[in-house]
């Protein structure tokens, strides 16, 4: 099993952008944390980030075709992209929606997600630990 970890716009700026909201962990450090946790769990992981909606859609389509589970932090596309929602509807191996910040404690426009209704689960506000929790969930659910 390869778990796809897909990150949307501005997540490549972690550690540089709004540290009070997103923390001080850089994107490179996040990738290292995810890869280290995947190694401990004995699972393959592919971590990607794009500011392009089209590229993100392509990766979701690839995951759907491969029947890979997806951990998705779509960033602002969470609140705006019907196209991403429609692509995620094709996922059959599970979708965990992750947000580093608690989007429900922020601006009103961040409270709506086009993805949550399709997700197996949603993790918000737990910082980068949310990704690791999502990894553990997929591994545990695959072995049960």
From Swiss-Prot:
<feature type="active site" description="Proton acceptor">
    <location>
        <position position="22"/>
    </location>
</feature>
<dbReference type="GO" id="GO:0019631">
    <property type="term" value="P:quinate catabolic process"/>
</dbReference>
<keyword id="KW-0028">Amino-acid biosynthesis</keyword>
<feature type="binding site">
    <location>
        <position position="79"/>
    </location>
    <ligand>
        <name>substrate</name>
    </ligand>
</feature>
<dbReference type="GO" id="GO:0008652">
    <property type="term" value="P:amino acid biosynthetic process"/>
</dbReference>
<feature type="site" description="Transition state stabilizer">
    <location>
        <position position="17"/>
    </location>
</feature>
<dbReference type="Pfam" id="PF01220">
    <property type="entry name" value="DHquinase_II"/>
</dbReference>
<feature type="active site" description="Proton donor">
    <location>
        <position position="99"/>
    </location>
</feature>
<protein>
    <recommendedName>
        <fullName>3-dehydroquinate dehydratase</fullName>
        <ecNumber>4.2.1.10</ecNumber>
    </recommendedName>
</protein>
<keyword id="KW-0057">Aromatic amino acid biosynthesis</keyword>
<dbReference type="InterPro" id="IPR018509">
    <property type="entry name" value="DHquinase_II_CS"/>
</dbReference>
<comment type="function">
    <text>Catalyzes a trans-dehydration via an enolate intermediate.</text>
</comment>
<dbReference type="GO" id="GO:0009423">
    <property type="term" value="P:chorismate biosynthetic process"/>
</dbReference>
<comment type="subunit">
    <text>Homododecamer.</text>
</comment>
<feature type="binding site">
    <location>
        <begin position="100"/>
        <end position="101"/>
    </location>
    <ligand>
        <name>substrate</name>
    </ligand>
</feature>
<keyword id="KW-0456">Lyase</keyword>
<feature type="binding site">
    <location>
        <position position="110"/>
    </location>
    <ligand>
        <name>substrate</name>
    </ligand>
</feature>
<feature type="binding site">
    <location>
        <position position="86"/>
    </location>
    <ligand>
        <name>substrate</name>
    </ligand>
</feature>
<dbReference type="GO" id="GO:0009073">
    <property type="term" value="P:aromatic amino acid family biosynthetic process"/>
</dbReference>
<dbReference type="InterPro" id="IPR001874">
    <property type="entry name" value="DHquinase_II"/>
</dbReference>
<dbReference type="InterPro" id="IPR036441">
    <property type="entry name" value="DHquinase_II_sf"/>
</dbReference>
<comment type="pathway">
    <text>Metabolic intermediate biosynthesis; chorismate biosynthesis; chorismate from D-erythrose 4-phosphate and phosphoenolpyruvate: step 3/7.</text>
</comment>
<comment type="similarity">
    <text>Belongs to the type-II 3-dehydroquinase family.</text>
</comment>
<feature type="binding site">
    <location>
        <position position="73"/>
    </location>
    <ligand>
        <name>substrate</name>
    </ligand>
</feature>
<dbReference type="GO" id="GO:0003855">
    <property type="term" value="F:3-dehydroquinate dehydratase activity"/>
</dbReference>
């Amino acid at each position: 099993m390869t778990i796809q970890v897909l990150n949307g716009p501005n997540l490549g700026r972690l550690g540089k952008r709004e540290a009070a909201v997103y923390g001080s962990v850089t994107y490179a450090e996040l990738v290292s944390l995810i890869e280290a946790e995947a190694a401990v769990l004995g699972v393959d992981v592919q971590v990607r980030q794009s500011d392009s909606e089209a590229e993100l859609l392509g990766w979701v389509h690839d995951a759907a075709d491969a029947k890979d589970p997806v951990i998705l932090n779509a960033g602002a596309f969470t609140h705006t992209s019907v196209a991403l929602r429609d692509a995620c509807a094709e996922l059959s191996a599970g979708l965990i929606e992750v947000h580093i910040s608690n989007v429900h404690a922020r601006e009103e426009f961040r409270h709506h997600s086009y993805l949550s209704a399709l997700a197996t689960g949603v993790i918000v506000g737990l910082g980068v630990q949310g990704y690791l929790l999502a990894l553990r969930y997929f591994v545990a659910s695959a072995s049960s």
